[in-house]
From Swiss-Prot:
Keywords: Chaperone, Cytoplasm. Pfam families: Prefoldin_2 (PF01920). It comes from Homo sapiens (Human). It is found in: Cytoplasm. This is p53 and DNA damage-regulated protein 1. The gene is PDRG1. The keyword Protease does not apply. One of its GO terms (biological process) is protein stabilization. It comes from the Eukaryota. Belongs to the prefoldin subunit beta family. The keyword Cytoplasm applies. PANTHER family: P53 AND DNA DAMAGE-REGULATED PROTEIN, P53 AND DNA DAMAGE-REGULATED PROTEIN 1. GO terms for molecular function: unfolded protein binding.
Length: 133
């Protein structure tokens, strides 16, 4: 039987390890989804270079090739890209929360600037006007 102090340390280490595993799993999933997104981007680029819209194209699904119409293929890949973008953005938001929880569990201060959002077009124009003037 462990002493109360040893049990407390063990619980702390288990909690930190679980949080770190969640962070690493999310990072790995983001990398995997980004790889798929890049492959889709390559496919879209190849479809744009091929100007023969009337012909069918060969598409690889896993380990199987299927012949599909050019416009439907492009639309399908674009929908997949939108889905991947949303999924990656959702994972990144979750990752920020999980990293903050991990830092909190470790007793470290919250990362400064980690929750910043980019300026939109209107904000950027207003900032340029202010800086010029």
């Amino acid at each position: 039987m462990l002493s109360p102090e040893a049990e407390r340390v063990l619980r702390y280490l288990v909690e930190v390890e679980e949080l770190a595993e969640e962070v690493l799993a999310d990072k790995r999933q983001i990398v995997d989804l980004d790889t798929k997104r890049n492959q889709n981007r390559e496919g879209l680029r190849a479809l744009q270079k091929d100007l023969s819209l009337s012909e069918d194209v060969m598409v690889c699904f896993g380990n199987m090739f299927i012949k599909m119409p050019h416009p439907e293929t492009k639309e399908m890949i674009e929908k997949d890209q939108d889905h991947l973008d949303k999924e990656i953005e959702k994972l990144r938001k979750q990752l920020k929360v999980k990293v903050n929880r991990l830092f909190e569990a470790q007793g470290k201060p919250e990362l400064k600037g980690f929750n910043l959002n980019p300026l939109n077009q209107d904000e950027l124009k207003a900032l340029k006007v202010i800086l010029k003037g």
